[in-house]
């Protein structure tokens, strides 16, 4: 039985994060590709972020350019909009940034919804 394919969409914030991080971490696209493949296969890895009102998940991604394991890796945050549509919200290096504020994630979703009715 085939798994339903999920449409994974990188929001502008996520794309900007990639452009910034790729300058320092050349293998970032290879590092996140397995996660994107999991999402496209309908899996929802990571921990749900509480207190936002949206089904948002945060997970650790190993940074192969940084030999500190997952704790020195990236945090990828995505929004499970529907069962067949996932939005990649943001991506950051844990060694360069603390946790993202829940309100910022909500703002990213609402800004995208306003500009794409």
Each PLM stretch: what is its role?
Residues 58, 73-81, 85-91:
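Short, hydrophobic/aromatic-rich beta-strand segments within well-structured domains
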Residues 1-68, 82-83, 95-117:
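Basic, Lys/Arg-enriched alpha-helical interface segments
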């Amino acid at each position: 039985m085939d798994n339903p394919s999920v449409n994974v969409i990188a929001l502008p914030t996520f794309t900007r994060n990639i452009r910034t991080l790729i300058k320092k971490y050349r293998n970032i696209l290879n590092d996140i590709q397995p996660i994107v493949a999991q999402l496209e296969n309908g899996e929802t890895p990571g921990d749900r972020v509480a207190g936002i009102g949206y089904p948002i998940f945060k997970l650790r991604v190993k940074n192969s350019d940084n030999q500190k394991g997952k704790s020195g890796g990236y945090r990828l945050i995505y929004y499970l909009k529907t069962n067949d549509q996932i939005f990649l919200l943001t991506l950051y290096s844990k060694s360069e940034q603390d946790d993202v504020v829940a309100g910022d994630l909500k703002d990213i979703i609402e800004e995208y919804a306003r500009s794409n009715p």
